[in-house]
């Protein structure tokens, strides 16, 4: 009888330990050994258990991979931030800054706004997060010259691969729907390309939509100009112009 009870207890203990062992094995996976879709599938398996703080370190590691390899998985980053939200003692401001930077690189998607809802306002005012919220405000209000001044004054931004390129591409998109033609001087200022050769190379990379004519750059194709002339409203114009008129 006692032997039967001992066996039952051992079976119960084994059943209890098995999920813990499986969980530990899951978070012990070396991310560097996974590539491409295999890595994404593994991360998706982790975030399915989105309230388990044990996965936070692995998601932080994956965030660093996103930074270094210029990839992006918003769901993984938002899951990590949610874990910080429910486990404030594990909060890592450096990791939050990195995920906010990746969200800015994905403008004009509202990823940054979504993440900001999960960050206490008092922490938003602390570095290294404050510089990101300031930049977000400049970009949202189309204060592009101020945005570049801010970016150039903080090495944090230049240390993130492709960050400046992504921000420049976002600004280019805004300019393309705002201006039909713009002076090459103003375009250089708004894109933070003071070197004429670099600016011309950038404009040429946008061809055939962008075209240089003397000191002016056309930012829209003839077809785009006609379509926008047919659909542009005064209400749209009244919202955009104040951000450029100083």
Swiss-Prot record:
Residues 1-30 are annotated as: Disordered. GO terms for molecular function: ribosome binding; RNA binding; translation initiation factor activity. It comes from the Eukaryota. Keywords: Cytoplasm, Initiation factor, Protein biosynthesis. Coiled coil: none annotated. The keyword Kinase does not apply. Transmembrane segments: none annotated. Residues 72-235 form the PCI domain. Residues 1-21 have a biased composition (Low complexity). GO terms for biological process: formation of cytoplasmic translation initiation complex; regulation of translational initiation. It is found in: Cytoplasm. GO terms for cellular component: eukaryotic 43S preinitiation complex; eukaryotic 48S preinitiation complex; eukaryotic translation initiation factor 3 complex. Component of the eukaryotic translation initiation factor 3 (eIF-3) complex, which is involved in protein synthesis of a specialized repertoire of mRNAs and, together with other initiation factors, stimulates binding of mRNA and methionyl-tRNAi to the 40S ribosome. The eIF-3 complex specifically targets and initiates translation of a subset of mRNAs involved in cell proliferation. Component of the eukaryotic translation initiation factor 3 (eIF-3) complex. This is Eukaryotic translation initiation factor 3 subunit K. The gene is eif3K.
